[in-house]
């Protein structure tokens, strides 16, 4: 299966009605992540061959709880499993040696 990959995508928790995020949007650059398999982040690929936003309804759309598997926050920030979140993966890269993978909040979240 082949997919057309956008150069970048902007992820915004502002999409959730009634929620005011504390941090700004995140623009994800696919080019910097081309050595990572799509299904590493888009876990529905092997089953449905569709690529949806991480915050699609029914996937990671829980904005109230930070620890639930459906949590928007956990999806991007957990450090318990380096293969399951942005921060976890970036932290693992830094642990392995010099890396320019961002870890500071404002490195990804633009106000």
Swiss-Prot record:
Name under which the protein is recorded: Cytochrome c3, 26 kDa
UniProt lineage: Bacteria, Pseudomonadati, Thermodesulfobacteriota, Desulfovibrionia, Desulfovibrionales
Pfam families: Cytochrom_CIII (PF02085)
Other facts noted in the record for this chain: The second heme binding site has an unusual CXXXXCH motif.
Function according to Swiss-Prot or TrEMBL: Participates in sulfate respiration coupled with phosphorylation by transferring electrons from the enzyme dehydrogenase to ferredoxin.
Binding site for heme c 1: 30, 38, 41-42
Essential cofactor(s): heme c
Positions of disulphide bridges: none
Residues that coordinate or bind heme c 4: 77, 105, 108-109
Note describing how the cofactor binds: Binds 4 heme c groups covalently per monomer.
Entry keywords, A to Z: Electron transport, Heme, Iron, Metal-binding, Periplasm, Sulfate respiration, Transport
């Amino acid at each position: 299966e082949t997919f057309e990959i956008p150069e970048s995508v902007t992820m915004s928790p502002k999409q959730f009605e009634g929620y005011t995020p504390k941090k700004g949007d995140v623009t994800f650059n696919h080019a910097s992540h081309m050595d990572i398999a799509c299904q590493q982040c888009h876990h529905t690929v092997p089953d449905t061959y569709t690529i949806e936003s991480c915050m699609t309804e029914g996937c990671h759309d829980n904005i109230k709880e930070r620890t639930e598997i459906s949590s928007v926050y956990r999806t991007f920030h957990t450090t318990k499993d380096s293969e399951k979140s942005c921060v976890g993966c970036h932290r693992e890269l830094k642990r392995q040696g010099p890396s320019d993978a961002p870890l500071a909040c404002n490195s990804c979240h633009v106000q």
